[in-house]
């Protein structure tokens, strides 16, 4: 027989940003426990609301199946001595099984005959073990900071108030986290029944919705919020900004979602939209509304947790709450514009970037020089890049950014425009932080790209230079910064070398007395290795296999755009028919050369070529070396590898017909030199011997 099983944990308000993660982990953990206990079922569905976590298991077996457990003993040859008496090993094994050696069965395998003990183990009722399984599942939740409550010694993410466990209509007796199982379920704080009893698991979650006015189904609440918010925005001729992270958070904050539309005074639209949106989304969890051409409307959509008979009062209340915050933004904006950005530059002397690396003014000076250097390399306007670098951090000293920290950069852009700075300079103040996350937009022009790379490289080199390279944690977000630099270079195809960039960045940490702020002598090598290491994760995310990435990394190309061309070329080569054989041949050549402790010749001695196969290969290698020079010079690695694939037949013939390690030293050295020349052709692109089948 199988029944529906329900477990609901009633708690105090759970952290909204963690609710989905907790619920999904609870379901995954419990399903794993059921599997380990060999309890059959048809599925586990999770439910989550601000004050509850619940699971419902469909068709859960009421009883574990009986099973035969086999315990193999020693081999018969080792279980008895020459006289046929049981050895100590056999006796000890039998004792552990609770039998005598004579009672053991025999098992014959292809490796011999063994003693065997078979025991029938009766399955336990699910009701007897499910409490322990649920407790283990909860104990495995990803809770960074568990808490205690009352006089209890148990810990959980929030205090637990109720516990309900039902198998069909039967109450499962037990205690988890210090709370005994009961049929009592809590409803909404302000609507429906505060508490009520549930008779069977099948009633959940419908009874909670009907009597308790709580939608326990997380995905249902989210779908309602999305659909109703889109309708509400359309009703006022707009489009709601339904960013998924915010939708998730709001879904986790409400038990009974009611979507409402409110407004604010149009005069606030004179303030940059980003500041208003920051207030609405960050502080109040409201959804901004835009026109089709991305202009902010004087409206916002919010989700109430109650179904009011007078929704206008709820709307007015939210409008009243947001108005002072918008007024603050307006005040800061007007006040900040009374001073130019450049006038705030000296104030950066009072802000520490990092104790050993100096002030933000020091960092600004370095960014200015490095941005100019990079701009020159990529053909961007040098003076505009330097100007943008000089102004890059000035908005950190404004009231707006001090109050609304996430507006850094974008407010700098608006203030720069107000001050009459060139548009490229203004854009760079915002785009210096791009890309902010994986998949984010890149800086839109060369000036912005130069400043963005300069800012990131200064941070990376500086932090590595004082010996604080990221290990587990990454407080300065150096991994993200490194990937940002690489993305900008690769996606714009800039001919930049990390060696040059890192060396230039390092040089700018020199102080007036000739010493450097940096104390790590290996900073250049460590930074380059760190940044190249970011390629591994990036290209794996792009779908390239690890061995392709490793094949390129083995050559340590330090020009990111060049690295990208190599990866794509090797990926294309791997699909060719000749790839597997040539990869194996390169591996074989590498192994042969590694064992040779002599000195290779400077060039092949044609007079020493004896076998037809080695003559053909030598000719092909010579022709290929000359033919591939243009492809190598221009970085056309795909064309080069496609041509190198033609060497498969002469390479195969060489290994089939030529004794490489000949007794004659001159012959051996000449053949090894030929193989080395062959391998070097491939190594100009990647170490294809690392490619897997």
Curated annotation (Swiss-Prot):
Principal subcellular localization: cytoplasm
Catalytic activity: tRNA(Gly) + glycine + ATP = glycyl-tRNA(Gly) + AMP + diphosphate
GO terms, molecular function: arginine-tRNA ligase activity; ATP binding; glycine-tRNA ligase activity
Protein name: Glycine--tRNA ligase beta subunit
SUPFAM superfamilies referenced in this protein's UniProt entry, alphabetically: HD-domain/PDEase-like
Top class in the EC scheme: ligase
HAMAP family per record: Gly_tRNA_synth_beta (MF_00255)
This protein's record includes keyword Transport: no
Family classification: Belongs to the class-II aminoacyl-tRNA synthetase family.
NCBIfam families reported in the protein's UniProt record: glyS
InterPro entries linked to this entry: DALR_anticod-bd, Gly-tRNA-synth_bsu, Gly-tRNA-synth_heterodimer
Subunit structure: Tetramer of two alpha and two beta subunits.
E.C. code: 6.1.1.14
């Amino acid at each position: 027989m199988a029944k529906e099983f329900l477990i609901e944990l009633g708690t105090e308000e759970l952290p909204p940003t963690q609710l989905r993660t907790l619920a999904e982990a609870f379901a995954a953990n419990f399903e794993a426990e059921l599997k380990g206990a060999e309890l059959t079922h048809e599925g586990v569905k999770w439910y989550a609301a601000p004050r509850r976590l619940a699971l419902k298991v469909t068709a859960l077996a009421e009883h574990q199946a009986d099973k035969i457990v086999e315990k193999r003993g020693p081999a018969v040859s080792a279980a008895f001595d020459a006289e046929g008496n049981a050895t100590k090993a056999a006796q000890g094994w039998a004792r552990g099984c609770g039998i005598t050696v004579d009672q053991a069965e025999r098992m014959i395998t292809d490796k011999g005959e063994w003693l065997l003990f078979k025991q029938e183990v009766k399955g336990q009722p699910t009701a007897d073990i499910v409490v322990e399984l649920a407790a283990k599942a909860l104990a495995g939740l990803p809770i960074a900071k568990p808490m205690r409550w009352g006089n209890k010694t148990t810990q959980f993410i929030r205090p637990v108030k109720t516990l309900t466990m039902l198998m069909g209509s039967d109450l499962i007796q037990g205690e988890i986290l210090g709370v005994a199982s009961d049929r009592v379920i809590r409803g909404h704080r302000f609507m429906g029944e505060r508490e009520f009893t549930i008779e069977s698991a099948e009633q959940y979650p419908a009874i909670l919705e009907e009597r308790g006015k709580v939608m326990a189904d997380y995905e249902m609440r989210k779908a309602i919020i999305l659909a109703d918010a889109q309708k509400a925005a359309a009703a006022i001729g707009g489009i709601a900004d339904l960013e998924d992270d915010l939708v998730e958070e709001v879904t986790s904050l409400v038990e009974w979602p009611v979507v409402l539309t409110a407004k604010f005074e149009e005069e606030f639209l004179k303030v940059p939209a980003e500041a208003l949106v920051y207030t609405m989304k960050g502080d109040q969890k409201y959804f901004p509304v835009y026109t089709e051409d991305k202009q902010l409307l004087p409206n916002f959509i919010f989700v109430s947790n109650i179904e009011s008979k007078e929704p206008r009062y709820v709307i007015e209340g939210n409008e009243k709450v947001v108005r002072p915050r918008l007024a603050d933004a307006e005040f800061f904006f007007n006040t900040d514009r009374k001073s130019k950005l450049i006038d705030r530059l000296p104030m950066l002397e009072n802000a520490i970037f990092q104790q050993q690396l100096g002030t933000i003014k020091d960092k600004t000076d370095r960014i200015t020089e490095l941005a100019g250097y990079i701009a020159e390399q990529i053909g961007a306007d040098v003076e505009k890049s330097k100007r943008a670098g000089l102004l890059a951090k000035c908005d950190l000293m404004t009231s707006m950014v001090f109050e609304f920290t996430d507006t850094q950069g974008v407010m700098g852009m608006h203030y720069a425009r107000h001050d009459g700075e060139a548009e490229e300079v203004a854009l760079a103040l915002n785009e210096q932080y791009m890309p902010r996350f994986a998949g984010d937009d890149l800086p839109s022009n060369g000036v912005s790209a130069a400043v963005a790379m300069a800012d990131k490289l200064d941070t990376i080199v500086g932090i590595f230079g004082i010996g604080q390279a990221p290990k587990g944690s990454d407080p300065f977000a150096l991994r993200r910064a490194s990937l940002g630099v690489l993305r900008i270079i690769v996606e714009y195809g800039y001919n930049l070398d990390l060696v040059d960039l890192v060396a230039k960045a390092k040089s700018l940490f020199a102080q007036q007395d000739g010493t450097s702020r940096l104390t790590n002598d290996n900073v250049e090598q460590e930074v380059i290795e760190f940044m190249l290491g970011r390629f591994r994760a990036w290209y794996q995310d792009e779908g390239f296999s690890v061995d392709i990435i490793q094949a390129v990394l083995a050559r340590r190309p330090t020009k990111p755009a060049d690295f990208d061309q190599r990866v794509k070329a090797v990926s294309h080569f791997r699909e060719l028919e000749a790839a597997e054989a040539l990869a194996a041949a390169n591996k074989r050549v590498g192994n042969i050369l590694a064992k040779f402790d002599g000195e290779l010749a400077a060039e092949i001695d044609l007079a020493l070529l004896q076998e037809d196969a080695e003559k053909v290969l030598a000719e092909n290698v010579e022709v290929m070396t000359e033919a591939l020079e243009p492809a190598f010079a221009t970085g056309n690695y795909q064309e080069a590898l496609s041509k190198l694939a033609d060497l498969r037949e002469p390479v195969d013939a060489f290994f089939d017909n030529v004794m490489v390690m000949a007794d004659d030293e001159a012959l051996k050295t000449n053949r090894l030199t030929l193989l080395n020349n062959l391998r070097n052709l491939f190594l100009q692109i990647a170490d294809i011997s690392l490619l897997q089948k």
